[in-house]
């Protein structure tokens, strides 16, 4: 038995973390059961910092408990395992982690900015900084620690340092600024080195949100960098940002905005004729402890001429990313590129579906204006990212497909889930969901890569389990939780968007919306269930408790524009009839038309349901952590809200006798009804589906729940709904050429045509394909429940999930009256296999086949 897939805090060989007692993790590649492990950690010189010795246990993780670690410490580590025969396996390959800069005293650098006066109404060219670094001695190692309020790109002698795109990533820069650590040992040379940095507006000062509001976090972009060179004689040279750095803003990038694009004069060269100006920020940078945003897949276009006479490039896949191109040209020749997700009725590129137009601004522009230099021009976008499948190019230059690429840009999340079936449309839907996850994982989970690009908490919470089946989402999600809790108010309220920049007064009133702000409890809860990580509950418990208290305070209260519920006594005491809320959100237009005015008034049905459910989760968390008094309080309110919901369900305004599927799915999913109501709701849901032609009538919150609910009592109904190819329905999207998941069931026809074609939320159905259709569920540490449920017209389905405990696979194939099952359980885990009409069986690692 050998340890594989070594990770530190869910990261591969992280450089510059700020966790001084990190958890070291691994998987087992063979054998049945791990009975013991040994972890040895050593420093740069090979001195042992920690040796666990042979430690009994099957846990595939150990928390570092060796000599205290300090800033800049490098630790290499390896693992040896003992199997069920007590035989010792080979040592694993070595892994490593390095501590970053832990405190303010470690930072000798000063914040610098461009040397010009700022008018927040103006836009400015990209700042260019330069520092000459002389090296005379032999180096042992060198590290660059760098961050910005804005976006930076750093180069050494013209070569980009690292592969991070859009660094330093997105946070609420008023609360937390994350820095990166780069190993530049091999990039430096003896003699003269030129360190150059470009600094752009980014999220800090650039366009943010649907309306493209600027200066959300500040209006002065700034840079902080510290280069530490350790020589072989033990001495360290430190080069820091200060007012000796050269500066100018006369370089090639004349304008750069995340959403709107870049204006580039390729013939310009920065003069660095001025000096940087000192400034301050008042926050000690923090390590990101997250995977970087990097370039991934590349696509070359099919080039045609659009009806409007401009060149039209079809890259074949809707992505979040940017372009690279090269061609020969004369100085001053100009090309203009626009990017979008769709074509209009005439066959020209349109941005209608992604733009919000106000009197002040149209955004996003998703545009590049490029003026050529003489000779060979080589360009790649630096400080913008777009959502697009198509590009429209206005130019008289010849464009060659092989010299143009669309580059997908997203966080370096590793795909862990794969699915295939006998239905090609369903397989395409899963692929589209994978692409929407990629396109909306850019340091934070976003709603779309075009119009808003916000970290909407509702999207994140409903999609978390699907994302975690499809990708290693652990480090990414932990970083996002930091963003969520960075904004928490003193009363416990959590934001609807994280990081939150304070969009406007109206949007501010929506913070605390159930289904959205509940992310602060639901992601840690589900993280614990999927990753077996109780530490995340410990880390956030007090803050989760604070949000739970905020929910409790709303019980029994009436809010602005609240309607009378017609209930009294205990039910009235626990009903939630206060607080603004998005409600179900985005139900099909013919089921419940969207009306922005709905958000002004409370949604007592949705709010009471979610308060009961979330406080129930919180009670379970408190119990497992040993907070029994808290658990009793949370359970009391959860049960109180449940009974209030049952009372409300007897009233005309909230009756279960409805064709609104969400009103039936939600209480069934959250177990809110009494026995009589439950049986009625089950039958009424089937009737509602029949009345709607077996199409999806749910909205944002209930769509991920409906198949789970149906499969519990009518599997045929679940499959009938899944296989529906008409609108509204999941398969309608791939049937109509979607390569990513749409925001609205109606696609581009919804909400007056404003609807993103890359919104992952409706792809949350993929969770059910893994845990329902193929039956893969994590059930505690090192244990799975495998309970596949064949059905519908499917003859075959297979899912594999590379979980934190190892890769598990489940497939089934029907042939006449027989169904063949194949199930693979990873080393050092067990599983309970539950097959139709067959007694449950508990198994250890191995592959198991059945024919039933």
What are the functions of these language-model segments?
Residues 142-146, 322-341, 391-394, 458-488, ...:
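Alpha-helical support elements that line or immediately flank enzyme active sites
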Residues 90, 205-207, 236-240, 337, ...:
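Acidic/polar loop patches that form or flank catalytic/metal-binding clefts of enzymes
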């Amino acid at each position: 038995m050998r340890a594989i897939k070594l990770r530190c805090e869910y990261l591969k060989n992280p450089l510059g973390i700020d966790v001084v007692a990190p958890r070291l993790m691994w998987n087992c590649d063979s054998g049945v059961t791990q009975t013991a492990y040994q972890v040895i950690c050593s420093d740069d010189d090979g001195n042992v910092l920690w040796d666990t010795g042979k430690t009994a246990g099957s846990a595939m993780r150990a928390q570092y408990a060796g000599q205290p670690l300090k800033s800049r410490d490098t630790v290499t580590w390896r693992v040896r395992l003992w199997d069920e025969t007590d035989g010792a396996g080979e040592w694993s390959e070595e892994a490593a982690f390095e501590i970053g800069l832990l405190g303010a005293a470690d930072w000798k650098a000063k914040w610098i900015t461009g040397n010009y006066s700022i008018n927040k109404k103006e836009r400015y060219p990209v700042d260019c900084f330069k520092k000459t670094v002389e090296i005379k001695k032999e180096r042992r190692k060198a590290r660059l620690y760098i961050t910005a309020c804005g976006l930076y790109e750093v180069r050494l002698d013209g070569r980009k340092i690292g592969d991070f795109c859009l660094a330093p990533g997105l946070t609420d820069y008023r609360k937390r600024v994350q820095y990166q650590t780069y190993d530049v040992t091999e990039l430096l040379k003896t003699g003269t080195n030129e360190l150059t940095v470009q600094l752009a507006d980014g999220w800090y000062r650039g366009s943010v949100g649907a309306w493209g509001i600027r200066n959300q976090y500040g209006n002065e972009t700034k840079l902080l960098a510290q280069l530490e060179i350790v020589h072989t004689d033990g001495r360290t040279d430190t080069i820091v940002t200060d007012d000796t750095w050269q500066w100018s803003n006369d370089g090639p990038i004349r304008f750069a905005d995340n959403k709107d694009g870049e204006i580039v004069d390729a013939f310009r060269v920065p003069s660095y004729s001025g000096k940087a100006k000192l400034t301050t920020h008042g926050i000690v940078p923090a390590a990101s402890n997250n995977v970087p945003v990097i370039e991934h897949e590349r696509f070359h276009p099919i080039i045609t001429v659009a009806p409007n006479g401009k060149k039209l490039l079809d890259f074949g896949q809707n992505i979040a990313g940017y372009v690279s191109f090269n061609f020969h040209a004369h100085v001053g020749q100009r090309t203009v590129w626009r990017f979008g997700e769709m074509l209009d009725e005439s066959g020209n590129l349109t941005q209608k579906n992604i733009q919000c137009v106000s009197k002040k601004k149209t955004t996003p522009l998703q545009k590049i204006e490029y003026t050529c230099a003489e000779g060979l021009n080589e360009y790649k976008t630096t400080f913008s990212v777009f959502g697009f499948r198509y590009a429209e190019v206005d130019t008289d230059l010849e464009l060659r497909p092989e010299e143009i690429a669309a580059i997908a840009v997203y966080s370096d999340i590793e795909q862990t889930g794969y699915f295939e079936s006998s239905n090609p449309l369903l397989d395409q839907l899963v692929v589209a969901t994978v692409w929407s996850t990629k396109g909306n994982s850019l340091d934070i989970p976003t709603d779309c890569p075009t119009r808003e690009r916000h970290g909407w908490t509702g999207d994140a919470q409903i999609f978390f389990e699907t994302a975690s089946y499809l990708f290693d989402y652990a480090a990414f999600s932990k970083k996002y939780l930091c963003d969520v809790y960075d904004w928490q108010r003193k009363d416990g309220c959590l934001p609807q968007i994280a990081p939150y920049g304070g969009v406007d007064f109206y949007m501010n009133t929506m913070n605390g919306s159930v289904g959205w702000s509940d992310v602060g409890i639901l992601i840690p809860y589900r993280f614990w269930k999927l990753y077996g990580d109780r530490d995340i509950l410990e880390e956030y418990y007090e803050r989760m408790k604070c949000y739970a208290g905020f929910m409790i305070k709303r019980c029994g209260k009436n809010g602005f524009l609240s309607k009378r519920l017609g209930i009294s006594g205990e039910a009235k005491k626990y009903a939630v009839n206060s607080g603004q809320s998005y409600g179900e959100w985005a139900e099909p237009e013919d089921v419940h038309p969207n009306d922005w005015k709905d958000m002004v008034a409370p949604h007592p049905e949705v709010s009471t349901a979610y308060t009961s459910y979330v406080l129930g989760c919180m009670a379970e968390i408190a119990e497992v952590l040993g907070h029994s008094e808290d658990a009793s309080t949370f359970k009391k309110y959860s049960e109180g809200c449940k009974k209030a919901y049952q009372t409300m369900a007897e009233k005309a305004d909230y009756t279960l006798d409805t064709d609104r599927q969400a009103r039936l799915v939600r209480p069934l999913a959250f177990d809110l009804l009494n026995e009589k109501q439950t049986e009625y709701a089950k039958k009424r849901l089937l009737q509602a589906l029949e009345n709607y032609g077996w199409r999806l009538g749910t909205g944002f919150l209930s769509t991920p729940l409906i198949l789970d609910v149906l499969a519990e009592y009518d599997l045929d109904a679940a499959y009938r709904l899944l296989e529906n190819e008409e609108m509204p329905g999941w398969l309608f999207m791939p049937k109509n050429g979607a390569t990513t998941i749409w925001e609205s069931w109606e696609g581009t026809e919804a909400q007056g045509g404003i609807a993103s074609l890359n919104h992952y939320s409706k792809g949350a159905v993929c969770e059910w394909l893994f845990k329902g259709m193929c039956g893969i569920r994590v059930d505690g540490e090192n244990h799975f429940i495998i309970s596949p449920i064949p059905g519908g017209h499917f003859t075959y389905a297979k899912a594999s999930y590379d979980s934190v405990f190892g890769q598990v696979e489940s497939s089934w194939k029907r042939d006449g009256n027989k169904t063949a099952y194949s199930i693979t359980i990873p080393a050092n885990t067990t599983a309970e296999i539950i097959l139709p009409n067959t007694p449950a069986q508990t198994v250890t690692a191995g592959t198991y086949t059945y024919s039933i």
